[in-house]
C-alpha cells in the first residue's frame, strides 16, 4: 500500500509489495526493492539503493549529501542490503568521490539516532546502538555489536564479532572477536558470549583467547599480524 500523502518522484523505481506511509519523500534516482516497509516521514533521497525486506522507521533519512566540504555533487550512492531494520531518525549519507558509495549490508539493526557518514561500510548481522555516530570511511565487519552513544573516528575499522561498550569513543582500529571499552578504549577480553551465540566451539574460543594473550603480552603491533576468520567446528 502506498499512501496518497507520500511523494514519489516519477523516475524512482519501486518494487513489489512495498508499503509507503504518509509524508514519505522518495527522490529521483532511487531504487527500492520488494517487500519493504517505509514508515511515515522517512526520506529516501537521490542516489539511494534499497534492497528487499527492509523496515525503515519514521524520520530516517537515507541518501543525504555527505557532510564533507570537498563534495561537489558527484554521482554517488547510499546502498542498503536486505532485511535491515533502520529505526527512527537514522541518517545514512551518500558516498563521496573518494569511494563513491556508502554501504550497509544485510540483516542489521540500526537503532534510533544512528549516523552513518559518507563512504562508510557496515557489514551484515551487526547491531548499532542508539545515538552511535560513525564518521566517514569507517568499516564495521560482520556480526559486530556497537553499543549506544559510541563515537567512531574517521577511517577506523571494527573487526567481526566485536562488542564495543556503550559510551566509548575511539580513533584506532579494534581487532576481531574482542570486547572493547573504557576511556581511553582498551582491550577488555574476548567476546565469549557473542562467539558462543554465533556457534563458536569452546576449543576455538580458547584458541582465540590464547592468540590475543600472546599478542598483548608481547606488545606486538596488530598491523604486523593477519587475523583471518576461523573455520568453526561444532
Task: Identify the role of each PLM range.
Residues 2-181, 185-186:
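Structural signal for interior beta-strand "rungs" in well-ordered beta-sheet cores
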Residues 118, 226-234:
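Single conserved hydrophobic/aromatic residue that forms the stacking wall/gate
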Residues 184-202:
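SDR active-site lid
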Residues 197-224, 228:
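An accessory alpha-helical subdomain
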